[in-house]
């Protein structure tokens, strides 16, 4: 495999010009009545206003949503129609579970590299509050049959076959379709398999909240978060509401395990909460950005996706995807100024950190003669991570990209890794560069 170059045929790089997100809100709080499509429109509309770019110049929108709403299956197109862009703007939706907005950003980048577009918007939105509540298979079949009946007798005959349990609503599935295991159960398995203790998990969660709280207090986050006025428009939200600004390590020990009550170590406090929110990034061909006089945040240097088995260690995607992107870009872990890893669970993040430094894991699973290297924790999730900020599934990647680029710029430039696990044994890794 040759060296990866994220450039057009003329040698122009793919620039990230701006990024923005809504505040992230815990399920059933400030965004309790706001569907994901409206969160997406909200953040893209504000992004266009802040960058002062003519919406008609946007060639393409690629957006994602993990928890799909049947009434708006193509969230990207709804965003185009709802934010004043040219009616002919190309728009399509993607999903890669928790790595969705990494995928949408890569899709826009590849369109730029191919010369198909000059300017695109990528991102994702999810609501854990406004969910599609389904019905049982038997009720669904009966409703279809009912629509084809003509007489009262025929209708009664169809309805007579339904029991009380058939009428119960069916919430969205939280388990893997292929295994029946939830993400939390997998995190629990990884903690046990890789010797990640409860104390280590709680310490990472405390670190995440402490660093995120400090980042907000230091004014590092406000510039990438819009003020939202959600329905019913009686109050606004300008900050994430999941961050524990008074986090103490002792407080985490009080919670009971959530997935293995007797022997477990994964709790609600050392996991990401269900969250509502949206995030987006504006990408351009480097030359076009300069023509428009846009300040460039940074560039995509490389990216990789991975897929592994789902029976165990399903959330080890960052280790596999990072190995691929380091190889394709010719970089080493030591070349990186910052490393930002999605914290789905403290157990998952710590297991990956451990495997980055494992020669045995590298030889048996990555095709490497030795480990990628030990992660310098002074470079790792320096502003806190998903455990603190929250995790609207499709929005997290765009949050990480914007947050990382802005922090790199504050530090005078360099290279950074963004990486995430995702359901289905998927993983994503992206190298970002700031001059």
UniProtKB/Swiss-Prot annotation:
- What is the annotated localization of this protein? Cytoplasm
Keywords in alphabetical order: Acyltransferase, Cytoplasm, Fatty acid metabolism, Lipid degradation, Lipid metabolism, Transferase
Per the record, the pathway is: Lipid metabolism; fatty acid beta-oxidation
Active-site residues, as the UniProt record annotates them: 98, 391, 421
Task: Kindly indicate whether the keyword GTP-binding belongs to this entry.
Answer: no
Q: Which InterPro entries match?
A: Ac-CoA_C-AcTrfase_FadI, Thiolase, Thiolase-like, Thiolase_C, Thiolase_CS, Thiolase_N
Q: Name one Pfam family in it.
A: Thiolase_C
Q: Which GO terms describe its molecular function?
A: acetyl-CoA C-acyltransferase activity
Q: Which GO terms describe its biological process?
A: fatty acid beta-oxidation
Q: What is its EC number?
A: 2.3.1.16
Q: Which PROSITE patterns match?
A: THIOLASE_2
Q: What is its main location?
A: cytoplasm
The reactions it catalyses are: an acyl-CoA + acetyl-CoA = a 3-oxoacyl-CoA + CoA
Identify the SUPFAM superfamilies for this entry. Thiolase-like (SSF53901)
Top-tier EC class:
transferase
- What GO cellular component entries does it have? cytosol
What is this protein for, i.e. what is its function?
Catalyzes the final step of fatty acid oxidation in which acetyl-CoA is released and the CoA ester of a fatty acid two carbons shorter is formed.
Tell me how this protein assembles.
Heterotetramer of two alpha chains (FadJ) and two beta chains (FadI).
Record family assignment: Belongs to the thiolase-like superfamily. Thiolase family.
In Swiss-Prot or TrEMBL terms, this protein is called 3-ketoacyl-CoA thiolase
Species source reads Vibrio vulnificus (strain YJ016)
């Amino acid at each position: 495999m040759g060296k990866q170059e994220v450039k057009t045929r003329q040698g122009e790089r793919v620039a990230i010009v701006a990024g923005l997100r809504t505040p992230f809100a815990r399920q059933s709080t400030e965004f309790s009545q706001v569907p994901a499509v409206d969160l997406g429109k909200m953040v893209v509309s504000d992004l266009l206003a802040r960058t002062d770019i003519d919406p008609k110049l946007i060639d393409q929108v690629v957006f994602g949503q993990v928890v799909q709403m049947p009434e708006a299956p193509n969230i990207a197109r709804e965003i185009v129609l709802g934010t004043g862009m040219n009616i002919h703007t190309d728009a399509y939706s993607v999903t890669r579970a928790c790595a969705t907005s990494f995928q949408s950003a890569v899709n826009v980048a590849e369109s730029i590299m191919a010369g198909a577009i000059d300017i695109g918007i990528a991102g994702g939105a999810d609501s854990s509050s406004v969910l599609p509540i389904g019905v049982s298979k038997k009720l669904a079949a009966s409703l279809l049959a009912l629509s084809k009946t003509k007489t009262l007798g025929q209708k009664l005959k169809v309805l007579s076959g339904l029991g009380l349990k058939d009428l119960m609503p069916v919430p969205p599935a939280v388990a893997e379709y292929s295994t029946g295991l939830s993400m939390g159960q997998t995190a629990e398995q990884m903690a046990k398999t890789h010797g990640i203790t409860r104390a280590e998990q709680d310490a990472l969660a405390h670190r995440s909240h402490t660093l995120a709280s400090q980042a907000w207090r230091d004014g590092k986050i406000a510039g990438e978060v819009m003020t939202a006025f959600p329905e019913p428009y009686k109050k606004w939200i300008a900050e994430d509401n999941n961050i524990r600004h008074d986090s103490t390590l002792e407080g985490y020990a009080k919670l009971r395990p959530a997935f293995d009550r007797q022997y477990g170590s994964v709790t609600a406090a050392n996991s990401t909460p269900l969250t509502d929110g949206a995030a987006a990034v504006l990408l351009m061909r480097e030359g076009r950005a300069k023509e428009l006089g846009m300040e460039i945040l940074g560039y995509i240097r490389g990216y990789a996706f991975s897929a592994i088995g789902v029976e165990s260690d399903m959330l080890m995607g960052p280790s596999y995807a990072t190995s691929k992107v380091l190889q394709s870009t010719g970089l080493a872990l030591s070349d990186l100024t910052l490393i930002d890893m999605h914290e789905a669970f403290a157990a998952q993040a710590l297991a990956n950190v451990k495997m980055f430094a494992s020669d045995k894991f590298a030889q048996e699973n990555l095709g490497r003669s030795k480990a990628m290297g030990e992660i310098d924790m002074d470079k790792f999730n320096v502003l806190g991570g998903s455990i603190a900020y929250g995790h609207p599934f499709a929005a997290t990647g765009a949050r990480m990209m914007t947050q990382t680029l802005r922090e790199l710029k504050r530090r005078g430039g360099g290279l950074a890794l963004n990486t995430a696990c995702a359901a289905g044994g998927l993983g994503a890794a992206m190298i970002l560069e700031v001059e």
